[in-house]
Design a protein with these regions (language model features):
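Mature catalytic core of soluble alpha/beta enzymes
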Residues: 1-205
Length: 205
């Protein structure tokens, strides 16, 4: 990772920054990624420029994941796989191979409930058996036509794990990441409390 330094915010990202009396800074940033709004709160003694760098680091990582694994982007690596893996095996990038391999593992662990082939033509519960990975050369092959892999049900959770790694690398101990109110990562503490209050639980008779 490059040194943390003053970093100019990219155009798609908006942010606000406030410095506390104790010398810690609160940065709130938001942008659109993966067809949803991403809200980021960072609380740290790092400078505003250093925190902006972290946000841009996260933004770039999400852009990379979208370019690789977005089912709906015809230019993505995954879209190329869906177009050509029945014709001949396709060698995958290391990360996409690992993602699909993990999803196949989850399919087995959930007894088929988690299935990345549900958008295939003439889909049935055995469609996923037509997806074949080769550990030898990290290639993928579809043994029947019409098979399509869609990682949309996996990608946001994977993205949060990627963001967590970035925050650890940048030594950010207090953070809240919200991707469309459906995928949330909370680390450390809120500026004025312990932990992060995500929502109230309302009980009704």
């Amino acid at each position: 990772m490059p040194n943390l330094s003053c970093y100019t915010m990219q155009v798609p990202i908006q942010h606000m920054y406030k410095l506390s009396h104790e010398g810690s800074g609160l940065l709130y940033a938001w942008f659109l990624s993966m067809h949803t709004r991403v809200d980021i709160i960072l609380y740290s003694k790092k400078t505003e420029g250093e925190l902006l760098f972290v946000v841009n680091y996260i933004y770039d990582a999400l852009c990379r994941l979208e370019k690789m694994a977005n089912f709906y982007n015809p230019a993505s690596e995954l879209a190329y796989v869906n177009r050509t893996a029945f014709v001949s095996p396709v060698v995958l990038s290391e990360e996409l191979y690992s993602m699909i391999d993990l999803c196949l593992e989850y399919n087995g662990k959930t007894l088929g409930c988690f299935d990345i082939t549900v958008h295939s033509e003439n889909y049935n519960q055995n469609t996923i058996q037509s997806v074949h990975l080769s550990a030898e050369d990290h290639s993928i092959y579809f043994s029947r036509p019409g098979v399509a892999v869609n990682l949309s049900g996996f990608l946001k959770g994977y993205a949060l794990e990627t963001i967590k790694s970035i925050l650890n690398e940048c030594v950010i101990e207090n953070a809240l990441i919200n991707m469309g109110n459906s995928s949330v990562l909370a680390l450390g503490n809120h500026p004025v409390g312990t932990g992060w209050k995500v929502n109230n639980i309302l009980l009704h008779n």
